[in-house]
Amino acid sequence: MSTAPQLVVHRDKELMAQAAAARLITRIVDAQASRGSASVVLTGGRNGNGLLAALAAAPARDAIDWSRLDLWWGDERFLPEGDPERNVTQAREALLDSVPLDPKRVHAMPASDGPHGTDVDAAAAAYAQELAAAAGPENHGPVPTFDVLMLGVGPDTHVASLFPELPAVRETERTVVGVHGAPKPPPTRVTLTLPAIRTAREVWLLAAGEDKAQAAAIALSGAGEIQAPAAGAYGRSRTLWLLDGAAASQLPRSLYPPASA
């Protein structure tokens, strides 16, 4: 079931990252208190990595039991292990290498020099199997229940590696697919699909900067998900857009309360 998006607009991208990090700490701690563990889907890009860096610098990060946290990824650039452009490599540098995570609960997407070689479709199928193995009978489909799933929003409204009009955004059954011919490098990627994204309890969409203003306006104005993938990303209980003032500059103020600016 779709949830109407809530908007929170911060003064600048630094404040947005700090506030989002504080919000994420609270969600993780609450999930661990109520269910014993938490499950979060990370996003790459400047806003996703900025949030992780803010979390690394937050004293309250120690409230998290890092050994009871599962980390997944919404998408990945299909490159060799350790490549600096891979989302997992950047996440390790920003946060993961500085906290006591259980390595078995860090679920990176396959690399192009892994057991599946350069077969991105086989790599995507393997990640789908890993998700299915972690799902329980109480979960919504063949994926575990994600407490928070974060997505960066591209200037073209793409989220994860779901680009406008490409086959991946049209997928209705599979939870993970390989992407061929992405319009930004590298062209080959692995991504969660919209059906997988929509199983999350909460979906957070992050956008900062003037180059994201038109994308936010399009996605929040009722555009179709094939033309504007961000419009099709929503959670079961909450959909949250976290923006800075520049990214919100083309939105009518009626969409968000003045107090959030």
Regions from the language model: what does each represent?
Residues 42-47, 151-155, 208:
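Glycine-rich beta-strand-to-loop/alpha-helix junction loops that act as flexible
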Residues 3-4, 64-147:
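Ligand-binding beta-strand-loop-alpha-helix segment within the catalytic cores
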Residues 195, 201-261:
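ATP/nucleoside-binding phosphotransfer catalytic cores, i.e., glycine-rich phosphate-binding loops
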Residues 32-58:
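Glycine-rich N-terminal segment of FAD-binding domains in flavoprotein oxidoreductases
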Residues 1-40, 121:
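N-terminal glycine-/serine-/threonine-rich phosphate-binding loop
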Residues 148-195:
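Class I SAM-dependent methyltransferase SAM-binding "motif I" and its flanking Rossmann-like core
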Residues 54-65, 89, 164-173:
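A glycine- and small-aliphatic-rich helix-loop capping segment at beta-alpha/alpha-beta transitions
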